[in-house]
């Protein structure tokens, strides 16, 4: 029983309603992604490959579920283990500067080292732009989650290591960017 003797109105949600809510969710996410890209452009991000990565990689899958409604806002958000995902502007800026600093064209045989896998979002961006990404994370649970998400997108060009980033990855050095 629900309030004052009324039956709970939502014991079973019809499939049509579930489908409609998923469609609405997709439309909202696409709209928020487009708005985020405009914010990044307004803040000076110009590299079209970087903007395309930010636009297509589903950031909402990399954050804590309680914050999913804020996934495409330009701010850091909690992920797990007291850590946060960087705000999209920082991800875009670091990636844009890395591309400029390594003098690489997208698609060249380049390899980069990422210190701190975290959520795996930055890793996914790098994996779409570089041939090889070596990513170090000190918190095993974060590394395993990031690896699982990124492999589900077919990003097989990432090598993960559970270690302290201060130690680097000497057996794979040198890197074209860090």
Q: What do the predicted segments below correspond to?
A:
Residues 15-16, 130:
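Short, linear, compositionally biased motifs with a strong N-terminal bias
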Residues 25-113, 142-144:
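Class I SAM-dependent transferase core
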Residues 99-177:
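Conserved nucleotide-cofactor-binding alpha/beta core module
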Residues 3, 7-9, 18-20:
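Short hydrophobic targeting helices and cationic amphipathic motifs
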């Amino acid at each position: 029983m629900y309030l004052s003797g009324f039956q709970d109105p939502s014991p079973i949600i019809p499939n049509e309603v579930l489908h409609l809510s998923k469609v609405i969710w997709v439309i909202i996410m696409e709209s928020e992604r487009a708005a985020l890209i405009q914010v990044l452009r307004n803040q000076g991000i110009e590299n079209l490959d970087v903007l395309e990565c930010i636009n297509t990689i589903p950031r909402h899958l990399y954050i804590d579920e309680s914050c999913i409604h804020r996934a495409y806002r330009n701010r850091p958000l909690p992920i797990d283990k007291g850590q946060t995902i960087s705000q999209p502007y920082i991800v875009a800026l670091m990636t844009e500067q890395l591309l400029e600093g390594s003098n690489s064209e997208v698609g060249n045989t380049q390899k980069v080292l990422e210190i701190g896998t975290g959520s795996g979002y930055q890793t996914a961006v790098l994996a779409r732009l570089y041939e090889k990404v070596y990513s170090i994370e000190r918190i095993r649970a974060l590394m395993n989650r990031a690896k699982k998400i990124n492999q589900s997108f077919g990003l097989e060009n990432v090598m993960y290591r559970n270690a302290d980033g201060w130690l680097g990855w000497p057996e794979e050095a040198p890197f074209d960017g860090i």
